Amino acid sequence: MSSTYPYTERFDVVRGMPSEGRSRRAILDDLATMASEEDKAWESGQCSGTMYCGDHDHYAFMADAFKLFAHVNVLQRDICPSASKFEGEIIAMTLDMLHGDAVHDTTPAGLVTSGGSDSILHAMYAYREHARQHRGIERPNVIKPETAHAAFDKACHLLGIELRRAPIDPATTRADVAWIAEHADADTIAIVGSACNYGYGTIDPIEEMGRLALERGFGLHVDGCLGGFILPWGQELGYDIPLFDFRVPGVTTISADTHKYAYGFKGTSVLAFRDIDLRRDQYFFLTDWSGGKYCSPGIAGSRSGGLLAATWAGMTSLGREGYLGYAKAIFETSFAMQDAVEAHPELRLMGEPTFCFSFTSDEFDIYHVNDFMRPRGWRFNGQQYPNALHMAVTRPQTQEGVADAFAADLAEAVDYARQHKDEPAKSGAIYGGVAGGMTNEADEFIRSVMADMMDEQQAIP
């Protein structure tokens, strides 16, 4: 059975527009079957990231809010003024959490986008337009640590911005700020720091980067897409988490995904600005169109009111107390799982992570551990250079017994890896780096395989 098309033999494949419609009941029955089977992949708590809440009651509550506004286009605020309430209050709650009140010389603002990559794209667009209008920069560049998300590479590719990749300290996995300072120039429009980075769960030296940004006069974007809605609660709980938000002078934008640790539905994120004027630099206007005067705050035109309503409902139903409670359980579980990793001399954590961690081995290929644990139901995210396994701890992992099961299975996996260390790992070809480093030929082959995979995912069998 194809992993891409597992339902081919059980459900009809729609190969063209049906001549007659099916009954709604039959359609919903099919959907319920698929959903029930797919939920099993994460309900056990063995799946890294992906499902951040895992509470079906919370999902049902947000679905109730969603369906009330699912048909509404928030572009038309005269018909749905509620969208301004939802959007404005989502932004206000996010700015409150990120200490927008620490800003006194400008007016903080925000933009609700469709996800983390979209927030990053809008941030890079805002910096490009601001630099063009106010600094006369026509050939802009951005500097990011090599660990910063691939969305920055995508955004710079789409926007025609040169991207420079700074190395990290291999011991701490944090950005090399001295390298950034040396390679920034008069055309640098922004630098990037992660809080935390996706790969290792470590936080870049944001305060040091903020001082550099102020000294050199460019922006500092903090990518909190993953950590933005949990690290603030970790700070409040007393964990040793460095400053990364608007309390740091020099931080000009922060991305934080409401569809991750704010526990909203997929399809929303917030881009927070220290200065509303920077947000205005990425607005779009067309005043002489035959269809009338047109404007949009971001790249999207039409958007469903359902996602705004559901996100707003989810955030206001949890409140500070709810978020703190969930964060406490997640941090405690993450550190228990990290302790299980550190119990094995052959394994080591990458840097000093918090709720999200990655581990590797200098004794054997870590993908031997993955080979053993995947049949047990564990789904890690694979890393490369060096090969490593990543676990973003979410609410499903906080269920009773999950951390203990992780420790027990990991111990057996390490024994397995010791016994098979002279053999190639089975999953290394899927996740791991190319031995000896990437070559042009290997890069071209991998791109071809990925393109075929994406074509398959958008086709029918």
Predicted regions and their residues:
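Glycine- and acidic
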Residues: 12-13, 70-78, 104-111, 139, ...
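Active-site-adjacent bridging/hinge elements
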Residues: 59-68, 91-102, 245, 282-287, ...
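Conserved PLP-enzyme active-site core in the AAT-like
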Residues: 7, 85, 111-297
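Conserved active-site and cofactor/substrate-binding residues in soluble primary-metabolism enzymes
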Residues: 22, 26, 57, 61, ...
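Non-catalytic terminal extensions of PLP-dependent enzymes
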Residues: 1-84, 88-92, 334, 343, ...
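Conserved N-terminal alpha-helix of the aminotransferase class I/II PLP-enzyme fold
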Residues: 67-116, 126, 130
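Predominant activation on well-ordered alpha-helical scaffold segments within soluble catalytic domains
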Residues: 63, 87-92, 121-128, 153, ...
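Active-site C-terminal subdomain of aminotransferase-like
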Residues: 236-354, 359-364, 437-441, 445-448, ...
